[in-house]
């Protein structure tokens, strides 16, 4: 089965075609991503209206390029899949409406994919990973530990009770006058800094629950920087190094508890695995800390290639292909959802507002 996937949930416009054979093995036939970093850089973050307009301008030609790269015509794909949430509603509408139109025009089945499910299933595309396994999703909008039991069978073990880790990186970078996007900038500066200079907090460290928290760490960075004004270059590098070290310690503690729970629930699992996905997974220091953690706990550490860790359409096409193998297509009446938890049966997370829990 060959599936055309479309991703427009945030600030990347993407189209891809993925093939899944009868044995469940996958192959990427094309994968095209257009980033909007230049459009949003002057504002220091993603502007939803600008993102939606950029998707409108780029998506048609990206779909054409994905088809051309795969050597296919639209009628030769077997299904169309698109991200239906969670994400910025304007971008979701652009991608979803385009995918529906293509599916209708080519008379192909349509699958509305949860963006988080795309991340959750990527390791099955790249590594053929069997169920069950653990997923750590760390990005600008999400920080979650998810137990992946099967297609559509997910349990959120832990989530952030305040800020996503990617947001903490971006806010730290902005506070220190570093360029957008903030994550790579903080990582570069941290390489030159002294991680022991500032004693920053490790939120929730040692607690039994499996959730994450980063707002206190972000506040501590602000207070530290304020006390040092005007900041020298050495101050900035040392703050970045201390911040990154605090994050690595926090993740190791929080994730380690989830690894122990997994071993308790699945004592006979021959190859326990931790999958790390999301843009923050590109950080080499954090990856090294998590890889060492997995080694100590007897887990395989799996991080898909960087271009498949960040937002892309190959993961959406693959999730559509996985669902197509066992489920009926979705209706073309399905609406986008700015908030769409991967495990809707789970209890709401801490700190939910009037509009409900974040995905």
UniProtKB/Swiss-Prot annotation:
Sequence segments annotated as region (Disordered): 328-359
Recorded GO CC terms: cytoplasm
Primary subcellular site in the record, as a coarse category: cytoplasm
Top EC class of this enzyme: transferase
Keyword annotations from UniProtKB, A to Z: Acyltransferase, Cytoplasm, Iron, Metal-binding, Transferase, tRNA processing
GO molecular function, one term: N(6)-L-threonylcarbamoyladenine synthase activity
Catalytic activity: L-threonylcarbamoyladenylate + adenosine(37) in tRNA = N(6)-L-threonylcarbamoyladenosine(37) in tRNA + AMP + H(+)
The organism's place on the tree of life at top rank: Bacteria
Keyword Mitochondrion recorded: no
A Pfam family recorded for this sequence: TsaD
Biological processes, Gene Ontology terms: tRNA threonylcarbamoyladenosine modification
Subcellular location: Cytoplasm
Cofactor(s) in the UniProt record: Fe(2+)
List of residues binding substrate: 137-141, 170, 183, 283
Assigned EC number: 2.3.1.234
Record NCBIfam families: gcp_kae1, T6A_TsaD_YgjD
Cited HAMAP family: TsaD (MF_01445)
Primary role: Required for the formation of a threonylcarbamoyl group on adenosine at position 37 (t(6)A37) in tRNAs that read codons beginning with adenine. Is involved in the transfer of the threonylcarbamoyl moiety of threonylcarbamoyl-AMP (TC-AMP) to the N6 group of A37, together with TsaE and TsaB. TsaD likely plays a direct catalytic role in this reaction.
Family that this chain belongs to: Belongs to the KAE1 / TsaD family.
Protein name: tRNA N6-adenosine threonylcarbamoyltransferase
Organism: Brucella canis (strain ATCC 23365 / NCTC 10854 / RM-666)
Gene field: tsaD
